[in-house]
Amino acid sequence: MVSYLDFEKPVAELQTRIAELRKATSDEMDLDREISDLEVKVQKLLRDTYAHLTPWQKTQVARHPERPHFHDYISALCEEFIPLAGDRLFGEDEAIIGGLARIDGQRVMIIGQEKGNDTASRLKHNFGMARPEGYRKAIRLMKLADRFGLPVITLVDTSGAFPGIDAEERGQAEAIARSTETCLSLGVPLISVIVGEGGSGGAIAIAAANRLLMFEHAVYSVISPEGCASILWRDAGKASDAATAMKLTATDLYGLGIVDRIVLEPVGGAHRDPKTAIDALKMALLQELAFLKPMDRDALRSMRRKKFLDIGG
């Protein structure tokens, strides 16, 4: 059953009515026509609602617990996936998953944050908030891909890097900086996709790419709206105002030249139809790979650096 967000209350009410009618249907009472009419209304209401989402509402959609996560993308995108673990310096961080994969027969290295989809998996993956060893693992895998000439694909979905004392003691800031530096220095294509939340340095550490793609209802920002509101107005309740001011939506960021391509989602968001959303992403990735793979190493590096130097120019 879909979890409804606050602004989806009218949709939830219609769906409840449909469920009641289905339960009441019997041989003596045919309610198929009424149910069909209500289903049409639901689709229209969803379409109208999602066509006019505010930035804060998009933030809620990006955080939806039923939105596809890294393992869902791997299962649907890749014919083959061989996970690689550990940073060879401290240990394994399961907030970041990565490994060798084949997408439509093409060999790639794929890396991304995994938030988890239930209590146990969320704790296991630390809600997608990586520690230094997670970013150092990403560095190791990116360098491995560079050595073997494999394109790198990263899927970003994190509220940010883990801010705990243990992470700081092990060099969180340095690990994020080194990971960003590694992204910029690769001589192979690097394609990054913001699939849900793209939060702060924890996101950009694996997203300094040749091409940055973003799902229609994803968000990408230097801080969460709640954090921004707490700093600017000392009131996290003003998160909606902060989200609007931060320009964190795919449309805003595409207009600013930060995002290169918006991947459209099914009506009602990727969580309502994961297969359609992932199929759209696969098509976009294959097109981007076809564009980038013929480029030589120097051209790829120059393209990546120019992209970031031009931001704000």
From Swiss-Prot:
Catalytic activity of the protein: N(6)-carboxybiotinyl-L-lysyl-[protein] + acetyl-CoA = N(6)-biotinyl-L-lysyl-[protein] + malonyl-CoA
GO MF terms, alphabetically ordered: acetyl-CoA carboxylase activity; ATP binding; carboxyl- or carbamoyltransferase activity
CoA carboxyltransferase C-terminal domain mapped to chain residues: 30-291
Pathway: Lipid metabolism; malonyl-CoA biosynthesis; malonyl-CoA from acetyl-CoA: step 1/1
Compartments, as annotated in UniProt: Cytoplasm
GO biological process: fatty acid biosynthetic process; malonyl-CoA biosynthetic process
UniProt main location, coarse: cytoplasm
Subunit structure: Acetyl-CoA carboxylase is a heterohexamer composed of biotin carboxyl carrier protein (AccB), biotin carboxylase (AccC) and two subunits each of ACCase subunit alpha (AccA) and ACCase subunit beta (AccD).
PANTHER family per record: ACETYL-COENZYME A CARBOXYLASE CARBOXYL TRANSFERASE SUBUNIT ALPHA (PTHR42853), ACETYL-COENZYME A CARBOXYLASE CARBOXYL TRANSFERASE SUBUNIT ALPHA, CHLOROPLASTIC (PTHR42853:SF3)
NCBIfam families: accA, AccA_sub, PRK05724.1
Similarity annotation: Belongs to the AccA family.
Protein name: Acetyl-coenzyme A carboxylase carboxyl transferase subunit alpha
